[in-house]
Amino acid sequence: GGYMFKVDRLDAGEVGIRPLAGQSFGNVGISGPGANVLAWVNPREVSLDPWKRVTPAQSTWLAGHIGEAWMTLSSPTFNDPVSGYAKYWDVAAMIDHHILNTATKNADAFRLSSYWHKPRYGKLTAGPIWDFDRAEGSTDGRDFDWGTWTTGGGTDFFTYPWYSEMFRD
């Protein structure tokens, strides 16, 4: 099937999509208990309907696939058009996702509030975009000053894993 997941806090009762032994997703998301863990969106991890609940096999497969994709980003041949990151990632969607979140100064982007999906037979795809309540001059403060694009504090838009590695290409 197809899958949707997110970089965000886990809901009650969830354990998330965790990297397999020897793999990493990079330092995605927040620090603390939810760090380096992705949360399921569809199918759900916790659902009363067993047909809408993710299976252990699905979770293991997606974790392994994301781990392989991450490993290509740190390989010496990461930018090889056949065996590098483009084999796993929808690059155009990554670029669009990054531009939309960065141009709107979305303080939650990349570390929280980031949806991703993996269409059946498709590549890992950024989006759909969401959660702009802390963007474009909101009361957050970090989204008002353009000088905070690379100051840390959750607004270092060009160093988040997955994206930062692709920016080397």
Regions found by a protein language model. Give the residues of each.
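Phosphate/dinucleotide-binding and metal-coordinating scaffold of catalytic cores
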Residues: 1-169
